[in-house]
């Protein structure tokens, strides 16, 4: 059973402000925390409100984090020029463009919503600790969950902006307006501390009705990733091995089964955000029809599968067969009614090994016997018209899964000791991807050769799952990779600059708070 998107009072207030409104109003003056947090139920609702913000288009909903973690690299590009993807995909981003919101997606939207989660999390923590209306056991459980969510948001902020405003106590907005940027190492130190608290106190597994909640293993994988960012390979390996050996998670035998929408809580998935159809929320205002229904374009479930699904007007390759394709889809209860804005890049499609079973889920260039113009990622689309309509999907959003951890363990072991004991981890992932051991077994590589094998294996295994650009940046090879590629519509290979490894702080944030420029007048190189 999915956790329903409960739109609680606190979430409604904190999420309905524009940036300017958010900085002009003090939400705590509208609903005082001391009057809201009167029971464990009240607090649990507030925590669900944090998850609700994470599901916004700016973060895990449509293309929020995808814009920054997958676009502008070597796996994904759009099937046409579009202003949704262009600033990151073509590296034309600047401070002003960072403020331009398209369907609640922009650098600014992501910045605001990550900090909304943090703002709310600080208030929840302040009102739970020592609250006599809540049992001590519930207090600890709630604080662990909220600390994980806050840590996750700060981790994303550091990944995207580096040094950033940082606070862990409730502040009035006048105080927030004058915060400068804290060194990212200082932020990550607190993040790791919060993640370790979460691992001690969060559950390892949840009952069916709570399976959308983050477990201790979600906190563990983020900690492992931070250790790897810092090249603390032993700590990273230790944490990966803890997940592999102690968690209830296991790799599935079939890669395709990982992404089956009818088995969204399978054993490989460490954490996924659950979505439901027909939930009102961030697109409600100004979009409801007279009968209270949503226009079809503004469904408020998970938008993301629609971004990976084809548009019928773009397909098939032989346009004279379009009606026949539509009829074949209809007979299957399907439709090409997506946007096609996230398809496999030319380089990715051209290099994906043809004997790799994963190719069929990542490179779909023929469907129902019709050759297609573009290669699509079927692992993320859902063409089911009745149960997963356009922009209103109930599909969960996979955030972390165990195959990632095996590849992380392989990387850590190789960096520490060379590849001798690392092959077992990468081959564990590859084994299900090929027909024979001769095909899947890697052996005989030196340390650099194994390092390059990891570069490729993470690409094939985790394509479209918000890892690639982050990986290329932490490996220090983003510029080299992008400059060496040919793209369909744009020229990111000539536009990219060294400073593009970080985002600019949006211009409107700088105008409200000039202190943000005191430690770096260049705004991450964009000035």
From Swiss-Prot:
Upregulating conditions: By ulvan and rhamnose.
Lipidation (S-diacylglycerol cysteine): 16
Chief place where the protein resides: membrane
Signal peptide: 1-15
Lipidation (N-palmitoyl cysteine): 16
Keyword Membrane: yes
Source species, domain of life: Bacteria
Membrane topology: Lipid-anchor
Keywords: Cell outer membrane, Lipoprotein, Membrane, Palmitate, Signal
Location within or outside the cell: Cell outer membrane
Function description: Polysaccharide-binding protein probably involved in ulvan degradation. Ulvan is the main polysaccharide component of the Ulvales (green seaweed) cell wall. It is composed of disaccharide building blocks comprising 3-sulfated rhamnose (Rha3S) linked to D-glucuronic acid (GlcA), L-iduronic acid (IduA), or D-xylose (Xyl). The SusD-like protein may mediate ulvan oligomer-binding before transport in the periplasm for further degradation.
Annotated family: Belongs to the SusD family.
Protein name, per record: SusD-like protein P25
Source organism of this protein record: Formosa agariphila (strain DSM 15362 / KCTC 12365 / LMG 23005 / KMM 3901 / M-2Alg 35-1)
Lineage, top ranks: Bacteria, Pseudomonadati, Bacteroidota, Flavobacteriia, Flavobacteriales
């Amino acid at each position: 059973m999915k956790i329903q998107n409960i739109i609680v009072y606190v979430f409604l207030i904190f999420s309905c402000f524009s940036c300017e409104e958010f900085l002009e109003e003090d939400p705590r003056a509208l609903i005082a925390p001391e009057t809201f947090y009167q029971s464990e139920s009240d607090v649990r609702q507030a925590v669900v409100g944090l998850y609700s913000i994470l599901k916004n288009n700016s973060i895990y909903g449509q293309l929020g984090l995808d814009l920054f973690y997958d676009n502008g690299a070597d796996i994904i590009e759009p099937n046409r020029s579009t202003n949704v993807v262009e600033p990151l995909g073509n590296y034309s981003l600047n401070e002003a463009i960072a403020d331009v919101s398209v369907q609640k997606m922009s650098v600014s939207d992501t910045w605001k919503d990550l900090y909304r989660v943090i703002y709310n999390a600080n208030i929840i923590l302040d009102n739970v600790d020592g609250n006599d209306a809540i049992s001590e056991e519930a207090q600890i459980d709630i604080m662990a969950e909220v600390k994980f969510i806050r840590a996750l948001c700060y981790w994303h902020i550091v990944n995207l902006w580096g040094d950033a405003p940082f606070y862990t106590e409730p502040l009035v907005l006048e105080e927030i307006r004058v915060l400068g940027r804290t060194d990212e190492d200082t932020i990550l130190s607190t993040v790791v501390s919060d993640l370790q608290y979460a691992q001690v106190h969060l559950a390892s597994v949840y009952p069916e009705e709570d399976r959308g909640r983050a477990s201790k293993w979600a906190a563990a994988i983020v900690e492992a990733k931070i250790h790897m960012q810092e090249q603390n390979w032993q700590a990273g390996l230790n944490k990966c091995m803890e997940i592999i050996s102690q968690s209830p998670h296991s790799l599935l035998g079939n890669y395709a089964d990982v992404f089956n929408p009818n088995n969204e809580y399978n054993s490989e998935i460490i954490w996924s955000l659950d979505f439901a159809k027909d939930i009102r929320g961030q697109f409600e205002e100004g979009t409801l029809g007279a009968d209270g229904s949503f226009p079809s374009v503004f469904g408020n479930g998970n938008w993301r599968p629609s971004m990976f699904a084809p548009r019928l007007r773009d397909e098939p390759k032989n346009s004279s067969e379009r009606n026949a394709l539509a009829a074949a889809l209809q007979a299957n209860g399907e439709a090409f009614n997506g946007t096609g804005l996230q398809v496999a890049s030319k380089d990715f499609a051209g290099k994906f090994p043809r004997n790799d079973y994963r190719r069929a889920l990542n490179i779909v260039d023929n469907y129902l016997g019709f050759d297609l113009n573009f290669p699509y990622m079927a692992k993320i689309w859902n063409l089911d018209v009745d149960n997963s309509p356009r922009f209103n999907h109930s599909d969960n959003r996979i955030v972390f899964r165990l195959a990632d951890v095996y590849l992380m363990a392989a990387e850590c072991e190789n960096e520490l000791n060379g590849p001798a004991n690392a092959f077992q981890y990468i081959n564990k992932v590859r084994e299900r991807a090929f027909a024979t051991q001769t095909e899947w077994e890697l052996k005989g590589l030196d340390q650099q050769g194994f390092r390059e094998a990891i570069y490729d294996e993470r690409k094939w295994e985790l394509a479209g799952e918000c890892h690639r650009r982050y990986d290329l940046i932490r490996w220090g090879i983003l510029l080299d990779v992008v400059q060496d590629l040919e793209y369909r519509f744009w020229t990111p290979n000539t536009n990219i600059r060294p400073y593009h490894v970080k985002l600019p702080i949006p211009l409107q944030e700088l105008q409200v708070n000039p202190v943000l420029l005191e430690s770096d007048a260049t705004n991450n190189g964009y000035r």
